[in-house]
C-alpha cells in the first residue's frame, strides 16, 4: 500500500502569499522596477513611475498592453504579463500599470504591444 499525499488547495491568504513570493523571486532574477506591489489571489498588481519602467517590463516579460481612460486627462497603460512558468506548469498573472497624460509621446515598441 502506497500512501499518496493529499494536496489541499491554498486558502485566499495562501494564494496571495504564493503569488507575491513568485513575483518577488522573478524580481530577484530580472531586477525590474516595482515600487508598488499589491498581491491578490488572482494576480499581482505593480504600479511603476513612468513609461520607461513599463518598457523595461515589456522587454523582459512580453505581454499585451491595454490603454484605458483614467479621467482628468490621464490614461492608464497596463501591461498584462506573467511570471515565468513554475515547475508545476503554473504562472502568476502580473498587471503592470502607469498613469500617462493623454497625448504623451509613447515609444513605438510599447504602442506596438497595445491590444487591438
Named regions from a protein language model:
Residues 1-116:
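Structured alpha/beta or helical-core interaction and ligand-binding surfaces enriched in interleaved
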Amino acid at each position: 500500500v502506497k500512501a499518496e499525499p493529499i494536496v489541499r488547495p491554498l486558502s485566499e491568504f495562501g494564494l496571495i502569499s504564493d503569488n507575491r513570493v513568485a513575483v518577488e523571486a522573478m524580481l530577484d532574477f530580472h531586477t525590474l522596477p516595482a515600487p508598488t506591489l499589491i498581491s491578490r489571489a488572482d494576480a499581482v498588481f505593480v504600479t511603476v513611475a513612468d513609461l520607461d519602467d513599463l518598457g523595461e517590463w515589456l522587454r523582459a516579460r512580453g505581454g499585451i498592453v491595454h490603454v484605458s481612460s483614467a479621467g482628468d486627462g490621464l490614461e492608464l497603460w497596463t501591461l498584462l504579463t506573467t511570471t515565468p512558468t513554475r515547475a508545476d506548469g503554473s504562472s502568476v498573472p502580473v498587471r503592470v500599470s502607469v498613469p500617462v497624460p493623454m497625448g504623451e509621446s509613447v515609444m513605438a515598441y510599447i504602442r506596438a504591444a497595445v491590444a487591438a
